[in-house]
């Protein structure tokens, strides 16, 4: 009895500091964001005026905010689908096929993940340069270009950011899936071969179901982190330009804060928070399956 109480006390003492810090630095600031979204406050004035839902009503009429949300959703969906498709395919190839230098390819694919967003943005900004960028130079070898392609112009800026984000993320998830695929017993594939199942059938009927728990976990994590990564790439590569064409919700929130619209920027933050929470819940619901064991 005494040992049981001592154990509970020990667990409480271990958990309490982390819980207190989480409450102070996560819960309280989040609640304060919700509170500030209901007020109007100037940049240099400590006075706050309660406006209720006025900031949220303004959001519905703000075309630039709607555009930034559309950009964010486009980036989240596109980057997630492309990254996970390539990560799974590359992981399957490097795990199942007898390719020399597997560790070398792991390192090569993983390197972009350890680079900072600023470095990656600098690399791709140099590649996308209209005058002497690598991409336009390569295209110029095959056809004459009277006017250089503006990869960071209004029409192509979002696809250009998508490419940079996919390049940065793909290696990390490939390595994670390789670890999961390596744990799948070879005997399952051998039995499938005897039954006449091809590699594609084995991939969808054996590999994917058996590593689905890992896919589901990483998918939820990646979708939420992409919302933040999209902001970092936009901030580093374009600062929301040109003419707000690459603005995402977070970058637009910061621009409103810099303009002194604190309450309005907090309202944008609340919308992003609720969107992230709802998206996570939807992903968990849609990807929920019975766990298969081997």
What are these model-predicted stretches?
Residues 2-294:
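A structural signal for multi-pass alpha-helical bundles of membrane permease subunits
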């Amino acid at each position: 009895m005494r040992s049981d109480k001592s154990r509970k006390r020990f667990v409480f003492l271990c958990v309490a500091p982390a819980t207190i810090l989480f409450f102070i630095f996560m819960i309280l600031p989040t609640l304060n964001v919700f509170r500030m979204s209901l007020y109007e406050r100037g940049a240099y004035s400590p006075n706050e005026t309660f406006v209720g839902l006025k900031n949220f009503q303004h959001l519905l009429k703000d075309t630039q905010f709607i555009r930034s949300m559309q950009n964010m959703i486009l980036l989240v969906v596109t980057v997630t689908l492309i990254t996970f498709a390539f990560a799974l395919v590359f992981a399957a190839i490097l795990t199942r096929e007898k390719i020399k230098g597997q560790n070398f390819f792991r390192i090569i694919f993983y390197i972009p993940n350890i680079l900072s967003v600023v470095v990656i943005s600098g690399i791709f900004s140099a590649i996308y340069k209209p005058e002497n960028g690598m991409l336009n130079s390569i295209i110029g070898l095959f056809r004459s270009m009277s006017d250089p392609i503006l990869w960071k112009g209004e029409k192509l800026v979002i696809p250009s950011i998508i490419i940079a984000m996919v390049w940065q993320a793909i290696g990390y998830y490939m390595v994670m899936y390789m670890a999961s695929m390596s744990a799948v017993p070879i005997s399952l594939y051998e039995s499938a071969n005897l039954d006449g199942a091809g590699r594609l059938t084995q991939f969808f009927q054996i590999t994917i179901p058996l590593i689905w728990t890992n896919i589901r976990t990483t998918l939820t994590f990646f979708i939420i982190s992409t919302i933040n990564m999209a902001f970092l790439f936009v901030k580093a590569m374009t600062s929301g330009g040109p003419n707000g064409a690459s603005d995402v919700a977070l970058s637009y929130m910061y621009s409103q804060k810099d303009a002194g619209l604190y309450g309005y920027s907090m309202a944008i933050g609340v919308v992003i928070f609720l969107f992230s929470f709802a998206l996570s819940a939807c992903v968990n619901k849609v990807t929920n399956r019975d766990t298969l064991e081997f």
